[in-house]
Amino acid sequence: MLLKVLPYLAAMLIAIRTLRDSGLIDRLTALLAPACGAVGMDAELLPLLLLRPFSGSAAMAALADLFESHGPDSGVGYTASVLMGSSETIFYEVALYFGAVGVRRTRFAVPVSLAAMAAGVLTALLLCR
């Protein structure tokens, strides 16, 4: 079992580390910041939203950064906490669990999961205004 899961897990962890160290998350945040303003979301929440589908620990680090800069009781901290609870590590779970059982075609699992996460994010943003 471990030999089946380990390559998928290692590839996901390496990809996340590369994304963070390359600065791509920061560039995507700067690129998407105007769209955040249009929907009434703080742009500081973007790294959390970008990392959460891939890694829970990377998203937790982004949450800790938000708590350190804004405080957990601030509007940003409250919204980030709700977002963290209403989203899931979609790609990590797909890579790990589907890889473990040898499923090659995930069919509708990823699109439906992303749609559910989008619904959770929008609901969280509406409730935390």
Identify the meaning behind each predicted range.
Residues 61-66, 70-129:
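C-terminal transmembrane helix pair
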Residues 1-68:
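Membrane-embedded alpha-helical segments and adjacent helix-loop junctions characteristic
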